[in-house]
Swiss-Prot record:
This is E3 ubiquitin-protein ligase KCMF1. Component of the SIFI complex, composed of KCMF1, UBR4 and calmodulin (CALM1, CALM2 or CALM3). GO terms for biological process: negative regulation of HRI-mediated signaling; proteasome-mediated ubiquitin-dependent protein catabolic process; protein K48-linked ubiquitination; protein K63-linked ubiquitination; protein ubiquitination; response to oxidative stress. It comes from Mus musculus (Mouse). GO terms for cellular component: cytosol; late endosome; lysosome. It is found in: Cytoplasm; Late endosome; Lysosome. Residues 175-192 have a biased composition (Low complexity). The modification N-acetylserine is found at residue 2. GO terms for molecular function: ubiquitin protein ligase activity; zinc ion binding. Zn(2+) 2 binds at residues 24, 27, 46, 50. Zn(2+) 1 binds at residues 9, 12, 33, 36. Pathway: Protein modification; protein ubiquitination. Residues 224-259 form a coiled coil. A zinc finger (ZZ-type) spans 4-60.
Length: 381
């Protein structure tokens, strides 16, 4: 409550500082603490000639204005963003801008939106007079019967009292209030920089309204019988809704049963069709299988082809026999040419030139070997 929560000085970078806060009405989102403002802090974009709006914390506001009663037109002191004059109320600021700066189109920040809770601290406008006429024209009276009010708890310049807020983010919304805050709709653009507690302010304002209009609320409030009637009506509506829900569920179940029966019928028909098709195709399949077996049993070669194959087999058998015999025959000396010729003649005499079985050839070969073993060895050279 005694600090500007979520606000930092753009000169000394002190955050959540105490005391007065000065808001520049020309530079976007530029704040100074009291010490930096009094020392004349400047930057490349900010100079000492820029109009500044002084904003107080809740504690300082209660200290300065505690116990005083303000009229509706004098809740605070505002600064003109064009000429820098201070001490204006909302009404007098509007009159001053309309008369002195009606043709000025410089972009400035609204001091009322920056100082009052519920406003945008960085609301930039190039038509300040129209903004004042549309947004801040109606007085904020809480009680129509009273001409004065205590604004000590209603409007205070201290923002940042409810929690931290972002310095460069704006959150826009439109609020309309009757009787409590304004008699006409007021459009604000508060940002998260507006961290004061709006709920506490609203509750305090509503408490004043209840005190002033307590009799009217008691006379026009709903009675116990009316509340009972409302409860009965709500119960009837619930019963009707439950009955309608049950009807819908019954209809859904019936439709599901119908769909299930139709699907079952379709599956049965498809099965019968498939069985019929299988029955019709079975004789044809049997005939085809018999036809294939018949083709396998039928001879595929003619007589000439069979003879040529037999002759080819005989030639192959002869070649194999000669190959085996050549490996079994013992090699003789190269000098005995006559013995070689005799062996070849004997080999021809065995009948190997003709086609013979393999066992017959082996038997003839054994006989030849036994005869050669009985002959005397040749004389040495």
């Amino acid at each position: 409550m005694s600090r500007h929560e979520g606000v930092s000085c753009d000169a000394c970078l002190k955050g959540n500082f105490r005391g007065r806060r000065y808001k520049c009405l020309i530079c976007y989102d530029y704040d100074l603490c009291a010490s930096c403002y009094e020392s004349g802090a400047t930057t490349t974009r900010h100079t000492t000639d820029h109009p500044m709006q002084c904003i107080l914390t809740r504690v300082d506001f209660d200290l300065y204005y505690g116990g005083e009663a303000f009229s509706v037109e004098q809740p605070q002191s505002f600064t003109c963003p064009y000429c820098g004059k201070m001490g204006y109320t909302e009404t007098s600021l509007q009159e001053h801008v309309t008369s002195e700066h009606a043709e000025t189109s410089t972009e400035v920040i609204c001091p009322i939106c920056a100082a009052l809770p519920g406003g945008d601290p960085n609301h930039v406008t190039d038509d300040f007079a129209a903004h004042l006429t549309l947004e801040h024209r109606a007085p904020r009276d809480l009680d129509e019967s009273s001409g004065v009010r205590h604004v000590r708890r209603m409007f205070h310049p201290g923002r940042g009292l409810g929690g931290p807020r972002a310095r460069r983010s704006n959150m826009h919304f439109t609020s309309s209030s009757t009787g409590g805050l304004s008699s006409s709709q007021s459009s604000y653009s508060p940002s998260s920089r507006e961290a004061m507690d709006p709920i506490a302010e609203l509750l305090s304002q509503l408490s004043g309204v209840r005190r002033s209009a307590g009799g009217q609320l008691n006379s026009s409030g709903p009675s116990a019988s009316q509340l009972q009637q409302l409860q009965m009506q709500l119960q009837l509506e619930r019963q009707h809704a439950q009955a309608a829900r049950q009807q819908l569920e019954t209809a859904r179940n019936a439709s599901r049963r119908t769909n299930t029966s139709s699907v079952t019928t379709t599956i049965t028909q498809a099965t019968a069709t498939a069985n019929t098709a299988n029955t019709e195709n079975s004789p044809q399949a049997l005939h085809n299988s018999q036809f294939l077996l018949t083709r396998l049993n039928d001879p595929k070669m003619s007589e000439a082809e069979r003879q040529s194959m037999e002759s080819e087999r005989a030639d192959r058998s002869l070649f194999v026999q000669e190959l085996l015999l050549s490996t079994l025959v013992r090699e003789e000396s190269s000098s005995s040419d006559e013995d070689d010729r005799g062996e070849m003649a004997d080999f021809g005499a065995m009948g190997c030139v003709d086609i013979m079985p393999l066992d017959v050839a082996l038997e003839n070969l054994n006989l030849k070997e036994s005869n050669k073993g009985n002959e005397p060895p040749p004389p040495p050279l």
